[in-house]
A protein has these predicted regions:
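N-terminal auxiliary segments of SAM/dcSAM-dependent transferases
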Residues: 1-29
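Short, hydrophobic/aromatic alpha-helical segments in well-folded domains
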Residues: 57-63, 79-83
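Structural motif corresponding to the C-terminal cap of alpha-helices
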Residues: 62-69, 88-91
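Conserved class I S-adenosyl-L-methionine
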Residues: 69-77
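Short beta-strand element of Class I
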Residues: 94-98
Length: 98
């Protein structure tokens, strides 16, 4: 391992430490979707709760990806599946099955 990679926290020990933390820890500070990335607030004055801002972000991504009519979806290491569950739940009537 290079010094740069180690300094960036990419050591095997750091990775194990991150992934060995149980879900209970993440439930303390994530919303019910368990989305582990920034939410989407409208502006600096937006006081929407985290769950609403996360849903806004998920909806934005699904809309821009055209997921409502997609013929397949691939979820690789995207947390706890919140994005995929939202995509399946918001399928357009008559959309092809996944």
């Amino acid at each position: 391992m290079t010094e740069t990679a180690h300094a960036a926290g990419a050591s095997p020990e750091a990775i194990r430490s991150h992934y060995d933390v149980g879900n209970d820890f993440y439930r303390l500070w994530l919303d019910e979707t368990m989305t582990y990335s920034s939410a989407m607030w409208r502006d600096e004055d937006d006081t929407a709760p985290l769950a609403e801002a996360q849903r806004r972000k998920i909806d934005w991504h699904l809309r821009h990806a055209g997921a409502d009519r997609a013929t397949s979806l691939l979820d690789i290491g995207c947390g706890w599946g919140g994005m995929l569950r939202a995509a399946v739940a918001t399928r357009a009537p008559g959309a092809p099955p996944l």
